[in-house]
């Protein structure tokens, strides 16, 4: 599929799913990152700006530039936005767990608790106002288990769930180019397109550093093995390090249980 076809696939599936489920409005967490930005663009086209409710949920490691990127995106799209800090609930969990944890939350416990605090807030809004929570995850992260169960894996539908991270970048650029051709403001801020992706759950964190591989390489390996059925040796013959290929395959296979908890997406419509 070309970029327009990929975009339309996600768009139409999102509209159909929400309609079947009885939702007219959606809620989305706006992190200032490229995944939530592209998802927001798709939601506005699917439901109209008045029916898309965006929330920024800064935590202890959120950066000012990401909040600005999220605000700029919302302004470009004309959607309602509000800020809900997760510091208070996060610190509440930290206090409650301090004794049994033997101190403050650290490592994955610290990072994942932040993600789950965000999702508790978004789900509360979904329940209170009958808004469908739209998931912003992508296939690269799902394959590598680079997500938080009951955190950023939550949501009723994931319009980008079948697209790799490199697809997300390409689709985001395509959306901006389309807007320019139509004489409109490019919806996704330029800074979102060029900054290193980060979940901002720890100081200075960047996705590619955490994964140990850049997205361009990762996606090529995942596509060759899982989509095209090539063996690890055949993938390595394409110009990749065999040890790296094997490591990625082992990790992806080991996180199948996480993928089973991901919401439905256009390429995996188990709800039909």
Give the positions of each predicted feature:
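ATP/NTP-dependent adenylation/nucleotidyl-transfer catalytic domains that generate, transfer
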Residues: 1-31, 36-272
